[in-house]
A protein has these predicted regions:
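Glycoside hydrolase catalytic-domain context in secreted enzymes
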Residues: 21-779
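Bacterial Sec-dependent N-terminal signal peptides
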Residues: 1-24
């Protein structure tokens, strides 16, 4: 009887053998991660620790994310994204959707030992825990598992490999939970320059370094920006980041605003073109990296900000703070602020079509709600979001609040205070409900699910269960769409060694450096003193930085140091500490910084606290300011008039001016070259005549400035902002209107206006100038 048994066994095995033969997938393992190649289909990645198994259907491999043993629509990568997202949203509990609506607070990796972003590992600080830097903190496990958070804001990382390993640990952790929804990790911009870093052709770095947004704008070349987006997206994905909390496309219509440096300047058309290029670069995948419609494994969701434009804060004050909560429109120019969105971010050239997400600003767009006449922050304003963004401009992507908008206000001048402008009297749950009813999908910086589920119950009482369930699923579909399109449901895992080779690789470093060279504006070249001769002797004065506070309100220490890497300078020039021995002086300064327009000491001493934002170094007294502010009022203030008329302010870095004037005197007529790192427009009259040449940069390595000064590269950038003749014109200009200042004219007769710049031949007149520099008619 043995032979028939063998025959039966063999026959029983035949179907399985045939099925294996028909399989279109293969698998390889790298540690705990298995990578699956589907021939003619989407490739997969899953963690052996998550409990997820592979289903074979029609010969293809699929991940059984909810572990029910069958292929659900949302697990089927052959189906359209919207069909998958709707299927998954319908399966999610209210608590799970509420978690998807959260966006974590800032997460350094590893977690900090103290401060607002602190974390622990087995209840110990990292240094005492024995944990790896790539391990999940206790707090991360808590908000991922208990609060169902799937959108994590990653800040500092120790290295690309650690970032990749942390990503894999986080993805494996959530893959094993519930429906297996992956994390959509995000980042604020992280490609800025380190001024003292040295660029070596052919060498890699920690991450490619590019000029700041204003510097990208100063190229007046959208192709440079598109290339930045394309490269940055590859580096982001190698770090496990699939959403960029950028670009910032607000038009910088008030020169005093603290966030001017993050914009593409004051011109709506230039900002729109740069926004389009940036997002096309970030979101578009091509060739084998494309999944569908331009989306794929090199795509990073771009969250364009800040709708409907945050650059019109009264007096230039910023709405991270209660003292800057109002955006005002004395020029009736609200609509022009929408152009970078409607003509740029929502009208892409690439196949992805429009920005994946939008972030409204903290501001109350004062008296702009023509429907409900509400003066509440944009995140709460149904007219601003539902009527304008959603209905008029047909935007159906994710809308995510800026960070901490639902929190309680604690003080007028704290960066970490809640920013519930205009709805301070509502409970936290009521604020969440109002945000949802305004058309917003997601809460930035909120880790706790309870207020969202409370908001759901408020809605059920008001509109019924069916209405609120549909409203939640609507947001869930939008949020899931961005996770599906970037391939995260199929493979959210990285190979750390590949990440190490990708991030900061030589060709990326070179592209960033070339962009830096294209971003430096030459404003002055008296008697064609430039380019300087290499090998001459230079004097570089040390820069004094007084103690102060940064934009986040954190204390910064006093410093006296060289503002540029002197070892780099020595590769171009001989160096001396004695001006008498020098052929040239090279001075590196920063644009004036007088703070944000609020003085806490003034408030404590019985004043209102409001002072002018000063764009010159020396003391400025605001004799020409408005006697009565356009907007005002806060629960923590007993007055509504926020005027600063007659009050004074001095730049914190007034010593920069002294450095120029002192050096000019010490050089006794020998050439003085001034390089300004600019964050805001400034009044040049204080020192222009003491400089033979002036450069402006918006965040570059000092080496790039030296390459321009010595003629290794020719300056080609143009001013993306006007430079005011004085503070009187700053007070006279309207917060909401671009190109409306009298501009400074230097001793060579050149006007420092939008679009001005010099090359070795003189004033630049080219196709960029023809396209963007027009006579502007005031609205």
């Amino acid at each position: 009887m043995a032979k028939p048994i063998k025959l039966i066994t063999l026959l029983a095995l035949l179907p399985a053998t045939a099925a294996i033969a028909q399989n279109k997938w293969t698998e390889r393992k790298a540690g705990d991660i298995a990578f699956v190649t589907n021939t003619g289909g989407q490739n997969l990645g899953y963690a052996s620790t998550s409990g997820v198994k592979i289903l074979t259907v029609d010969g293809f491999a699929f991940k059984d994310l909810n572990k029910n043993g069958k292929l659900d629509k949302y697990e089927d990568w052959r189906l359209p994204v919207d069909e998958r997202a709707k299927d998954l949203a319908s399966k999610m509990s209210v608590e799970q959707i509420a978690g998807l609506m959260l966006y974590s607070r800032h997460q350094p990796i590893p977690a900090a030992a103290g401060g607002p972003f602190a974390g622990t590992y087995n209840n110990k600080v990292f240094a005492e825990s024995g944990a790896k830097a790539s391990d999940l903190s206790d707090q991360q496990k808590q908000f991922l598992a208990k609060d169902n958070v799937r959108h994590v804001l990653v800040t500092s990382v120790q290295s690309p490999e650690i970032a990749a390993q942390w990503n894999n640990n986080a993805q494996a952790f959530v893959e094993g939970l519930g429906l297996g929804i992956p994390n959509n990790n995000s980042s604020d911009p992280r490609h800025g320059t380190v001024a003292t870093a040295e660029y070596n052709a052919g060498a890699g770095g920690a991450i490619s370094m590019w000029p700041g947004s204003l510097g990208l704008a100063a190229t007046f070349d959208p192709e440079v920006v598109k290339n930045f987006g394309h490269i940055a997206a590859q580096e982001y994905r190698a770090l496990g980041i699939s959403t960029a909390l950028s670009p910032q496309v607000d038009i910088a219509t008030d020169p005093r605003w603290a966030r001017v440096s993050g914009t593409f300047g004051e011109d709506p058309q230039l900002a729109a073109d740069m926004a389009r290029a940036y997002i096309d670069g970030f979101q578009t995948s091509a060739a084998e990296k494309e999944i569908k419609n331009g989306w794929g494994y090199n795509s990073v969701n771009a969250m364009v900000k800040h709708w409907p434009g945050g650059g019109a804060g009264e007096g230039g004050r910023d709405a991270h703070y209660a003292y800057g909560k109002y955006a005002v429109y004395p020029g009736s120019n609200f609509n022009q602020h929408l152009i970078p969105f409607t003509e740029g971010a929502f009208k892409l050239n690439g196949k992805t079509g429009m920005a994946a997400a939008v972030m409204p600003y903290y501001t109350i767009s004062y008296n702009q709600d023509v429907k409900n006449h509400e003066n509440v922050a944009n995140n709460y304003n149904s007219y601003i979001i539902n009527d304008l963004l959603r209905k008029k401009y047909k935007y159906d992507g994710v809308v995510c609040t800026d960070w901490l908008v639902t929190g309680d206000e604690t003080t007028v001048d704290s960066f970490l205070s809640g920013k519930s402008w205009g709805v301070e009297g509502l409970s936290i749950a009521q604020r969440h409900y109002k945000v949802l009813m305004a058309g917003v999908d997601q809460f930035g910086g909120n880790n706790e699910v309870a207020p969202v589920t409370e908001a759901y119950q408020i809605g059920v009482k008001e509109h019924g269960e069916a209405f609120m369930r549909a409203r939640f699923e609507q947001s869930a579909v939008r949020l899931l769409r961005n996770i599906f399109r970037t391939g995260l449901f199929e493979n959210p895992y990285l190979e750390p060694e590949v990440s190490k080779q990708t991030v900061g690789k030589p060709e990326f470093m070179d592209a960033g450096y070339q962009a830096q060279l294209k971003s430096i504006v030459m404003l002055k070249n008296k008697a064609n003193i430039l380019p300087l001769q290499s090998g001459k002797t230079v004097y570089v004065p040390k820069k004094f930085t007084p103690a102060g506070r940064n934009f986040l309100g954190m204390e910064t220490p006093e410093k006296l140091e060289y503002p540029v890497n002197m070892e780099t300078v020595k590769k171009y020039f001989k160096v001396t500490d004695n001006p008498d021995e020098a052929d040239y002086a090279l001075i590196f300064i920063a644009s004036p910084n007088s703070g944000g327009g609020y003085n806490s000491a003034d408030a404590k001493n019985g004043g209102t606290g409001y002072v002018p934002v000063n764009l010159q170094y020396g003391t400025y007294t605001a004799t020409d300011a408005r006697a009565t502010s356009i907007a005002g009022g806060d629960p923590l203030e007993k007055f509504t008039n926020r005027t600063y008329k007659g009050k004074s302010s001095t730049a914190i870095n007034i010593t920069d001016l002294a450095m120029v004037t002192d050096t000019y005197a010490k050089m006794k007529g020998k050439p003085v070259i001034v390089s300004v790192n600019m964050s805001n427009p400034m009044v040049f009259s204080e020192f222009e005549k003491d400089a033979n040449a002036i450069f402006v940069d918006f965040g570059v390595q000092g080496q790039a400035s030296l390459d321009i000064m010595t003629g290794k590269a020719e300056p080609s950038a143009l001013l993306p902002l006007q430079m005011p003749i004085d503070m009187k014109t700053v007070e006279a200009q309207f917060e909401d209107v671009p190109h409306d200042m009298k501009c400074y004219v230097d001793e060579n007769g050149n006007k420092y206006d939008f679009g001005f710049g010099l090359n070795w031949k003189g004033v630049i007149k080219d196709a960029r100038v023809d396209k963007y520099v027009k006579s502007v008619v005031k609205p």
